Amino acid sequence: MSIRYIDEIENLSGKKLFMRVDFNVPLDDHQNITEDTRIRAVLPSINYALDQKAKIILASHLGRPKGERKEKYSMAPAAKRLSRLLGKEVKLASDCIGDEVKAMINAMQPGDVIMLENVRFYAGEEKNDADFAKALANDCDVYVNDAFAVSHRAHASVEAITNCFPVVAAGFLMKNEMNYFEKAMKNPIRPLVAILGGAKVSGKIEVLENLCDKVDKIIIGGGMAFTFLKGMGYNVGKSLVEDNLIDTAMKTYEKARAQGVKFYLPVDCVVADQFNPAAETKVCPIQEIPEGWMALDVGPATVTLFTEALQNAKTIVWNGPMGVFEMDAFSRGTFAMVSAVANSYALTIVGGGDTDVAVHRAGEYAKISYISTGGGAFLELLEGKKLPGIKVLEDKGHQ
């Protein structure tokens, strides 16, 4: 089965359209949204539904309230920001289920938009509970999932709820995410280069194993590189190493090499005597990391090596920073890679989370072909997994 998209649904006029979005946005201490990319990302789907004169009911989670109502996790800031972006009122419901919500939905006019309260205020959401899903559906007519970033979760508003609707579809954000992923992984223009960074190998080992069969080059930076380097016999001082994964990392490295994949690791690094922005730092080759010091960024020779490895790339997929870029002293490697990726002639796809933050901080996001809104979901696709939220859309797509 293939996924049906929102623009393939016949006659949305007057229909109650339930749309799962991901407005899990960062807030400051005063409940102000500090970054609204995820809200802006679903505007095309919302505007399309408005043009079709649908009644739009939006559902999302925010944070981890763990099945309890906590005001600091209210969807109020998101509803307010969306009102501003749409230039029209978005009413916030007092809850996401119940008679009061149902009455509010039944009173809607075509072109109205309602934001339901946080679906994770109920434990049934994360348990994928069928009864909660039925209550959440609120007798709506059509279900649209435009929340790629939570589609790796088998939660009630993502998976179980699809059984409550005769028509289910994906929104335009989901379409973009899937299209770009297929361009990178299903039929890429080669050479295809994967850049993986971040602190730990444990979060990326399945990704690496899957990528060995698909890519031409793998570049490894960040803390995860030091598990590989220790496995190769280097003394890495107090750098982050997952000793229990050294054997697995080395097997993956050997598998990549055996399949003709070029595998790049740091040749120098920025080391510090402590994990602190004010630490004493120096640049040294991988062979000369001082005892008791830790590597917190890749060094200039590594940046040159990695940049050269990207020279002939036609497709680049990147997930994970090169160092602890939140601290200025250890941010150069990540920002140099942002520049190299942004200025390459390749199709460039950046996976959400920290890498997304780095690209925005560097002011280079306009030069990246596509920035995914999903961190965990993007990684699970890279692992070769079927995401629960996407699988149900495929199964029920054009029934």
Curated annotation (Swiss-Prot):
Domain of life: Bacteria
One GO term (biological process): glycolytic process
Family annotation (InterPro entries): Phosphoglycerate_kinase, Phosphoglycerate_kinase_N, Phosphoglycerate_kinase_sf
Pathway terms, separated by semicolons: Carbohydrate degradation; glycolysis; pyruvate from D-glyceraldehyde 3-phosphate: step 2/5
Its EC number(s): 2.7.2.3
SUPFAM superfamilies linked: Phosphoglycerate kinase (SSF53748)
Residues that bind ATP: K204, E326, G352, G353, D354, T355
Predominant place of localization: cytoplasm
CDD domains referenced in this protein's UniProt entry, alphabetically: Phosphoglycerate_kinase
Alphabetical keyword list: ATP-binding, Cytoplasm, Glycolysis, Kinase, Nucleotide-binding, Transferase
Recorded GO CC terms: cytosol
GO molecular function terms noted in the UniProt entry: ADP binding; ATP binding; phosphoglycerate kinase activity
Recorded catalytic activity of this chain's protein: (2R)-3-phosphoglycerate + ATP = (2R)-3-phospho-glyceroyl phosphate + ADP
Protein's cellular compartments: Cytoplasm
Binding-site positions, substrate: D22, F23, N24, R38, H61, L62, G63, R64, R120, R153
Family the UniProt entry places it in: Belongs to the phosphoglycerate kinase family.
Subunit-level organization: Monomer.
Protein name per UniProt: Phosphoglycerate kinase
Native organism: Citrifermentans bemidjiense (strain ATCC BAA-1014 / DSM 16622 / JCM 12645 / Bem)
